[in-house]
Amino acid sequence: MPDMAALVVLNQARLWHKHGMVSRASRSDRSRKPLSAAKLDELALAYVARFATSRAKLTRYLARKVRESEWVDESDARTACEAVADRMERLRFLDDRQYAAMRAGAMTRRGLGLRRVKAQLFVDGIADADSGEAIAEAGEQAVAAAVGFARRRRFGPFAVRADDDPKSRERQVAAFARAGHSLALARRILAVPPGDADALAALDDAATTD
């Protein structure tokens, strides 16, 4: 039979656990601030003033704020989020086509390839109709972006010395692939000897795809 003292301790632990959990839950409920459609509009204005964003990213942000708060408006929260996004578009604070061009251009200048650009615009919720021009431009800049990547990483023509180790070469090809470049284009650039400016200049301007 259990010791009486042990039973007392066990019961105290159970009571503490029960009331402690209730207390924490109550504090959590109290910390959920009320949120209305008007406040949602204010949050959106602050967000677009601070960040360049897409419609999808803004609506995700607003939806998260709704989840973290106590919705007190009569309108449906999801409908309210979409209505706020509509208003931001009418005010020209949101323009997915312009955002896509800016985002793709920045990625290309950082040496990232077409595949990474496409993937990022998809994640950002950009529709095909709004991303098409940006993706086409990234395709036209594929060689320049890959050369920029090689320069940043000191691969191929930008290496201090030639590296003929096959394993090292494949690691470099893999790095190009992770950056969104085609394997064929990566191998063309890596085949250029260090310091051979003429061979580097002779690379095609068009993107090479697998």
Q: What residues fall within each predicted segment?
A:
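An alpha-helical, amphipathic repeat domain used for nucleic-acid recognition
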Residues: 2-210
